[in-house]
Amino acid sequence: MPTISQLIRKPRQEKTYREKARHLGASPQKRGVCTRVYTTTPKKPNSALRKVAKVRLTNGFEVIGYIPGEGHNLQEHSVVMIRGGRVKDLPGVRYHILRGVLDTQGVKNRKQRRSKYGAKRPK
């Protein structure tokens, strides 16, 4: 326990917390260009081929973004919008690619949670 004079000399420091999506800066989303689109396998105990893309952002950072939903049309040089949000079983994947924005098409035949996947309302 510090004395009063010690606290006057050096006040208490506030804890600094690490940003979770630091490459976005202060923006909620960022635009970028796909440099590589590929699949990767999750950590144990899960098993799948998860679709991810390496994206070069407009601020110069290169990040890995997850492509949600079934099927996608992304390839190299596709322009995408990225948001924060990690994928728990994919190490290093801390961003999500937004569906139905810029070059990314929405998910086909999506009936529920359509806004998350950029799907139009079915007739």
Curated annotation (Swiss-Prot):
UniProt cross-references to NCBIfam families, sorted A to Z: rpsL_bact
UniProt keyword list: Methylation, Ribonucleoprotein, Ribosomal protein, RNA-binding, rRNA-binding, tRNA-binding
Coiled-coil region(s): none
InterPro entries: NA-bd_OB-fold (IPR012340), Ribosomal_uS12 (IPR006032), Ribosomal_uS12_bac (IPR005679)
Role: With S4 and S5 plays an important role in translational accuracy. Interacts with and stabilizes bases of the 16S rRNA that are involved in tRNA selection in the A site and with the mRNA backbone. Located at the interface of the 30S and 50S subunits, it traverses the body of the 30S subunit contacting proteins on the other side and probably holding the rRNA structure together. The combined cluster of proteins S8, S12 and S17 appears to hold together the shoulder and platform of the 30S subunit.
Protein name: Small ribosomal subunit protein uS12
BP GO annotations: translation
